[in-house]
Amino acid sequence: MESFDQTNLDFKNYIGRLDIKWDLVDGVLLIARQQYPRLNQEKYKNLVQSMTQQAIERLSSTTSKIEKINALNQFFFKEMGFHGNDKDYFDPRNSYISDVLDRKEGIPISLATLYLVLGWASGCKLHGINFPGHFLVEWRESTQDSSQNLYIDVFNAGKILTLKDIQERLNHNLGSEQKLEPAFHLQSAGIRGILHRTLNNLKVIHASQGLTDRALWETEWMLLLKSNDWNSLRDKGLFSYSLGRYEVAQQCLETYLEKTGKPADYAQVWQVLYAMKARNTINLN
């Protein structure tokens, strides 16, 4: 418990300086320390730094964006051997960056994390993209003319996607036809957004495995990153209820309903609140 408490404190301190010290690697390593309290962060930071220097060298003679992307793909996927884990997609190790570095495999967002770090250091105009169901990377040439931008699928060896490809993926991921709205479906994800989505992936996995305490930790970290994430506040309330922490559950669920009005899960949330009242564990106003 002491080790986790220290990791929790370190993550809070990291969040406090995040807008000043722009460091994605530190953040994902702290998430890995949730699982591995004795993780040697310096070892993995040095490994990423070594990869970064190699990427800079590989891209030093490139000029165009296509040349840079091809060189980065050659280094990251072919030379280093990173690839998407399509055999066991929901293995939580795909989300812990230390495991991704050791095993050379991951899911879209964990591979994108490393790809972005290497690309940024090498002068690539890359951004993370919060595409539904499948994190992407964008080369953003211009914020005014999106036709000059490129979309990269790091889960599939850096394949460049057209907007038509992305439209087809959107329909597949959502299970229905929906018009692609770039301003909505292709929103940039800064460091906070990348960490938030990484934690959400782990939260979903651990909740499905019945590891409620782990899912609660991840939810609390998501709230540190985005305090007005009302869905995460609801989840914190539900996880707290499952763990018998009724006062926390009441506070979270009542605040969730207050902030969201009458959400789609209004009845279910009230059912939990009344279940606690029936046990005489809380008082409802």
Regions of interest found by a model, annotated:
Residues M1-N285:
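A structural boundary/capping signal
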